[in-house]
């Protein structure tokens, strides 16, 4: 576009230049017969009275000659013109100014900004700077993902809700007091100490049949070990049909207090087949038989019939497969945690809430529940934005997903990421390296990065990440010198100056990044190398554990998950009971058959 504009400007200037050429030709025409000795003095006289033009027989000839010379000059200029980009021959990459970018993107008040580095902030009102607030944070162990990014942004206490994936519970412990003082309602899904957790029941958020399908799909995906492949998917498919039948039954037929995974396990135990040769119906079979009498087209029946079409041996194997998937719900602690719901996910876009999901950093056994939580949270927030609040949540929701690789998300997460901005939802994806992202989303990882307008690199040791950051920085044009020396009788010494290109940072230079610094990429801006944010300089640090503000203690024990009491009875105080006299009669096989027939 700039090239076309420059071309048009050159043509306009060339046409305008014809006017002074014609004017000059008319002025000097009366003097051309005397040659150059007369032309030069006449020019001085002519310029004293520039509009005194005398037409003569040589006027036309003089004008044409000057136009010819002018045209030749234009032609020579155009023939030698090249598309030069001085000092950019091998690349135009360069470092941006942290202060200049901060001035462009920061907003007032200071709390309504996302802290990227020590000197760069991005306002939370994305409509002003037209950048989404999705951020990819990449840093190895010890690079400061929690200290230099997660904690500072929670300390902002902005007018938004926060969903924090918190391995070990460190973030909640350090900033919980500050958030509580700032008016946040703190909720905790604690999978480390479940007796301290708020309850979370996925059944509460099942609005329609599609939600039930998503729940079962997510459950099976998140309980499948990474890298495992089933040679025969039949058993998982059949087990999912049985689970769908049970959940559909509870959703439409059971009272609310029975709609939970503990009841699913009760129903599954009621389907147990003790003897493969015994054709008697199980209690679960009887339950669905009653349902068939009342509503033969019930959706739960459709799935139950599909499951029940095999032999007794096959049904038993399907039950074992499903029981293995759900075995964690046999634990009293998890059954109690999922028996009711206290999280109220839909309200997160309506009032300031901080929801912490605490997961052990050395045990992923219960991470599947966090995966279900995230899937349902996206569904609830999107539904609330689209159908209740006119397209955008009144309170923005930001998800800080520390150790992102530890949870399983929907396969279409890249699509979810691309449409959440307009609804007031944003995500910070926090990884140790890009290899983790590639392992999770083999085909969509580049799309996920592309949907994050900010990329913050904190340092690390993973080679493919070094290469990616180096390529993202681009190449710059530099000056180089080459030296030559020849010895002998006619020895000489020479120095040559030339330009060449090199990466702004080579992969090995990325690896050697000073641990005090971070590299920040913002869409449409030059990259910035700046100091990581110093948490001790934040004005709210005094209210956190890092500023000696005390450690936050959450969740007094509210649920006695398993209680065993010893009852001491004084046997002497027990009244004697009169026992009725009982007689017994031994029957023959023939007599027994007559009684039972």
List the model feature ranges, each with a label.
Residues 1-143, 147-152, 195, 475, ...:
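Basic- and hydrophobic-enriched, low-structure N-terminal and domain-boundary segments
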Residues 36, 40-47, 105, 486-490, ...:
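Extended hydrophobic/Leu-rich segments
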Residues 128-425, 440, 444, 508-529, ...:
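P-loop NTPase motor domains
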Residues 155-157, 179, 437, 472, ...:
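Alpha-helix termini
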Residues 203, 532-539:
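A short, sequence-level motif marking secondary-structure junctions
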Residues 359, 363, 403, 431, ...:
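Short loop or secondary-structure boundary microenvironments that flank
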Residues 417-419, 423-519:
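Conserved ATP-driven motor cores of ASCE-family P-loop NTPases powering translocation/secretion/packaging/pilus
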Residues 472, 535-537, 546-551:
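Short intrinsically disordered coil segments
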